[in-house]
Amino acid sequence: HDGFCLWPSEVASEVRGYPWDSMRTGPKRDLLGELFEACREEGVRPGLYYSFMEWESPLYSKSDKSEYVDRVMIPQIKDLIERYQPAVFWPDGEWDFPDTMWKSPEIVEWIYENAANPEEIVVNDRWGQGLRGQVGDYTTTEYDNLGNSSGKGMRKTRPFEECRGVGHSFAFNRAEGYDIYDSRTACVQRLIDLVSRGGVLLLDIG
């Protein structure tokens, strides 16, 4: 949720006042574009993750987040959809505020009306506080493949996707030893379990 952009995003650097995308600093490459091109060459339909929250943005740190939503979030989402035409749009970091604050209804409507691939693109259910399992094209559960929380009931009526890391974290965690990571056997067994119940597995390798 640090907001660093792996594609040429002028607004990210403009708002912060220093380079904050992969074209202006670091590799000076459109890493996202290169990944999408490589995926499509192999017949893989790529998706996009986008974090609503942005921990260190000077605009997100304000109590009134409307300027952040209008100046950063919405323009970036539209840019990503138009530029890369993802098959999946996967927002996250929505849980602290309602969908009206994020302007999610307007964003979803815009995506379905303006995406170059309207017959292909799907969106998940992470659009506002308390809405998981109720909106979007499918439900996302998290570290819940055994069905022992509220996600259990939703899976019976909606397509679902279980997302989790190979360890207990979605990113590098110095506190995790190798014994925390799932074995190959455990990963395969989890995948079989999910698919047998009509779900899919989104495995993060952080």
State each model region's role.
Residues 1-206:
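Mature catalytic domains of secreted/periplasmic carbohydrate-active enzymes
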